[in-house]
Amino acid sequence: MALLGRLLPLALALALGPAATHAGPAKSPYQLVLQHSRLRGRQHGPNVCAVQKLIGTNKKYFTNCKQWYQRKICGKSTVISYECCPGYEKVPGEKGCPAVLPLSNLYETLGVVGSTTTQLYTDRTEKLRPEMEGPGSFTIFAPSNEAWASLPAEVLDSLVSNVNIELLNALRYHMVDRRVLTDELKHGMALTSMYQNSNIQIHHYPNGIVTVNCARLLKADHHATNGVVHLIDKVISTVTNNIQQIIEIEDTFETLRAAVAASGLNTLLEGDGQYTLLAPSNEAFEKIPAETLNRILGDPEALRDLLNNHILKSAMCAEAIVAGLSLETLEGTTLEVGCSGDMLTINGKPIISNKDVLATNGVIHFIDELLIPDSAKTLFELAAESDVSTAVDLFRQAGLGSHLSGNERLTLLAPMNSVFKDGTPRIDARTKNLLLNHMIKDQLASKYLYHGQTLDTLGGKKLRVFVYRNSLCIENSCIAAHDKRGRYGTLFTMDRMLTPPMGTVMDVLKGDNRFSMLVAAIQSAGLTETLNREGVYTVFAPTNEAFQALPLGERNKLLGNAKELANILKYHVGDEILVSGGIGALVRLKSLQGDKLEVSSKNSLVTVNKEPVAEADIMATNGVVHTINTVLRPPANKPQERGDELADSALEIFKQASAFSRATQSSVKLAPVYQRLLERMKH
């Protein structure tokens, strides 16, 4: 094993080549992708790189690890081919690309990289070819032949009609008066071109894509005797206007222009920086309901959030997006920016109508839908995009809609739609009060909630917060999705209807005929005061059916010894509040008797000591009650205390309760949880 540990690093170093055995500067993302392509191509010989080509196009990419295994770029299938890595060439009869390309001057190197059209236009000028062939050190970002061919006819005509001014200036804009390799091309930097010292914008993305004024580098670092050539996929042009100036020029941004002016963001958009503006057109604003749009435009904070949600923190050129990316806006929302073929998508929608409009301080993509952040929405608007539509309909039917559309600071606890699969409660005064208890009197964020915290509701109740290892619950209901924080209200999506506590544990047990025998046993064991006082208890409450299932002799023996009865009853009471949503695969809950109860939950079935819980989460002010149809016994190896005081009275009380149970159990009918809740509210 020790020998293997020494050999593995050596084997890896030999596989990666000499560069891997020496510490040096960190490789750029482009160089790392190129290295991966070289590793994938090495089976075909030295200096062979694997290249992925989009099927049906001429677009090629050096392959990174993710693209290699997925065989997709922008959701489209690719084919793998193998070609010489930059700077190498084939030798007849030899495997791979063993020979280093001979160096020539810049002009000749243009032909080597496949930019013969650039050579042709260079020949048409009087001054440029001698510079490219003469002494000096230059960098040329050379458009590919396809890039020149894709220029609009009127643009190309204007260039070639005046070759010694327009064409010469255009070519000089693609040049820098020093050698610049890809490891020097830093994200967000500007290079000074040889045309009037105009800036060229460089972006070097983590996925290895490098862009020059949003044109992608196709073949990089081709050395020449007097410089270096990088092949790019577009003809680039000078950039003179900032983002704000472009907004002022474009007629399609009339509404955006007014909104920016009202928000004061024009200072940001005309200042220094590198941003991406997802610029909504006039039509995008017109798609929004007038009431919503007027509300946002009239609210300075909501308006600023709206506009900031259209600004990314860095310049993102379209060519840099080859798969889905999560990008944060200035507002703080994360947008999913992706691509499908040649189309860019925002949150999965192809809403970008024009891309890569360059500005001196970033790039603009035109969009035809407005991106309204949660922070600019009402609770109603938040709920419309969430899985809580049934609950929101209940609030509206109960006449509580104004709370969800106004400027009241609230947190809405909205049960998800699946809670109501068996139907919804009838709207009456009690239901309305129940719904009011799903509204907290403050705008909260779940990340600030803590165990034992109490929350005041519009219905006048105090709700408790329970924090468990894998869940966060408010009374019996647990948060089922991330918060949605709106302009004034926050939406919590809950996994069930919330049950406010209606009394102590003893009040709950006394108010339910199913527990008459248990109540009698508690009274005879002297535990009434315990379950009435302030505390945090979880009670696994045996029903009358559970007691009646005990053999008569065992039942009489149990009831004939008050101390043993108290010991067993204490074993049914945990010393903390554990609602069903807080139960994981297994929770060991310490009982008041001293031993631990094993509580688990699987597929919505809660068990205690492997016995099923018939009904969970009956909330009390000092705990929670879970109904069980069995009597639990402490572990047999723990000696039970014995005694016979109060035995006669205990047995008598129990007999009376048993008789009462037989008389009433036929009339007890299990109802849906929310109906039972409404019944408890009568007491």
Curated annotation (Swiss-Prot):
In-chain residues carrying the UniProt-annotated modification Phosphoserine: 37
Modifications after synthesis and translation: Gamma-carboxyglutamated; gamma-carboxyglutamate residues are formed by vitamin K dependent carboxylation; these residues may be required for binding to calcium. According to a report, does not contain any vitamin K-dependent gamma-carboxyglutamate residues.
Record flagged with keyword Cytoplasm: no
Pfam families in alphabetical order: Fasciclin
A Gene Ontology term for the protein's cellular component: extracellular matrix
GO terms of biological process kind: cell adhesion; extracellular matrix organization
UniProt cross-references to InterPro entries, sorted A to Z: Adhesion/Biosynth-related, EMI_domain, FAS1_dom_sf, FAS1_domain, TGFBI/POSTN
Keywords noted in UniProt: Cell adhesion, Disulfide bond, Extracellular matrix, Gamma-carboxyglutamic acid, Phosphoprotein, Repeat, Secreted, Signal
Residues spanned by motif Cell attachment site: 642-644
Tissue: Widely distributed in various tissues except for the brain. High levels in corneal epithelium.
Secreted keyword on record: yes
Signal peptide as annotated in the record: 1-23
Disulphides: 49-85, 74-339, 84-97, 214-317, 473-478
Induction: By TGF-beta.
Residue span(s) of domain FAS1: 103-236, 240-371, 375-498, 502-632
S-cysteinyl cysteine: residues bearing it: 65
EMI domain span: 45-99
Subcellular location: Secreted; Secreted, Extracellular space, Extracellular matrix
Physiological role: Plays a role in cell adhesion. May play a role in cell-collagen interactions.
Subunit structure and binding partners: Binds to type I, II, and IV collagens.
Descriptive protein name: Transforming growth factor-beta-induced protein ig-h3
Species annotation: Sus scrofa
